[in-house]
Amino acid sequence: MLKGITFFLIISCLSVQLLSQEQDSIHEKKNLLQRMDSITNWKVSKGRSTFMPFIAPSYTPETSLMLTLGGLFTFMTKPGNKILSRSSIPFSIGYSVNGSLNASIRANIYMMSDKLRLTAEYWNKNMPDNYWGVGYINGRDIPQSDSTTAYHRKWQQFKFKIAYEVLKNFFIGINHDRNKTKSSDVNAVMEADSNYMLYGDDIHNSGFGLVFRYDSRDFPENAYKGILIELASTTYGILKSTTSKYKAYELDYRQYQTIVRKGSTLAWQLKTRLTRGDVPWTEMSMVGTPFDLRGYTWGQYRDFSSIFLLAEYRYMFGRKKPNGRGEMFGPFGFVVWTGTGSVTPEWGDFTYWLPNAGVGIRFEIQKRMNLRIDYGVGAGSTAFYFSFNEAF
């Protein structure tokens, strides 16, 4: 753990140097950042599009050390509309020392004076991976090795939700999820796994469903106050190309409270997922992703149902003088969080709970949009994440 914390601190320092373009003095660094901030603020105030590139290392148990290239593209679907939030499309592509090649795009687009909202994600992974089987006990007790868990996975997923505001803060919409997994170099233990034997090594899924949402957050990407309650249901197997037929239900509750001043926020989230039917081993409910219990191996804990609870405190440091937007808090901050989660074959029978905690550093690259550096600790594992916007 000490090595992980040391690595986290070293990378954080390198990130600051990269953002400052390694000028010769602290004074020049501050001037450069102020000029960049002024240019970005001017573009944002005029409703113009902006682009922020980055290159940075990250570390997770499933990918090992990875070098990632990416960027954040923001824009207004209708410049000059003060009611409308800025749309954002962060993306990244990374290659790791264990041969993983991962790419992702996550979009939040606001239209029609914020009455129509589109969220979309695309993932593409070609990587050595591990499969422990289904259930908490397997994830905990089966040792990770080439002969017990290792295999190679090619995975693609595209999903979106589009919702329309029918009443103030109340949205109704549809969602779609399409994914496919191709596994190879499977070990003997995995070949004998009943779930793997049932669904095989080439799995395709396509689902459609409904979304019901209450959203009073002041800014969805980085809320200071407000509540999100979202209920989504997805039915898979409608299309002939789908491997199996099943249903998935999700409930996502988030709340944000400003503490004393803006930039000091207490946020918490409760999310659960329930599946029913012929659910493939690739699409079981999971905890331990970069967006919930940060610090675990993605995919180690999976079952028909999952639940997790997170509480996170976010703080942006103050300024001596207000910036161009008249704000007294600066572009740097930190977060601390703690949480727990569980997986189970039957919803409500959550017997075993996974602990989680972590710390993070934030760099505001434009108004209310942060570069996220997180170090998470789980039960016997740690992970280091470099991404845009908050985990929730």
Write out the residue ranges for each language-model feature.
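Bacterial Sec-dependent N-terminal signal peptides
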Residues: 1-25
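Short loop/turn motifs that connect adjacent beta-strands in outer-membrane beta-barrel proteins
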Residues: 37-49, 77-86, 112-117, 169, ...
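Gram-negative/organellar outer-membrane beta-barrel architecture
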Residues: 43-52, 58-200, 204, 370, ...
